């Protein structure tokens, strides 16, 4: 089948059905609200449709990259930092055990640079492999590994500054 037929409305419906909720979750983790995240997802998929000939086979990391750039443009235009997640955004199951630890991690994470936060979120929250995270960030896999290593070190250092902080490992390596 030639590429022209692969990038039709059926192709788009397929990637939309497969990845819409992932893109919304990506937005919720960065924006703190479902409505804003759904709006971001709509913008991401609009770009995907318009640039459908450029979308690689590994679609999800590419979609996250589009979302990342859309958010960066928005924050730059608004001259505001990315919003911190409120405690109310923490899933109910997490509220019972380890809530203080979760707050410590979120507080420390918020003190990191946007780039450090992004690599930790991509690997830890989004569960992307290093090569997928590299695609989102627009860098090589080796560079992404170094960024993750340094971000983990900085996060660990911040957590050690807090009282009774235990070591935390964000995400695995794939």
Residue locations for each model-derived region?
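C-terminal edge and immediately downstream basic/flexible tail or linker adjoining helix-turn-helix-like DNA-binding
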Residues: 1-6, 11, 135-136, 153-174
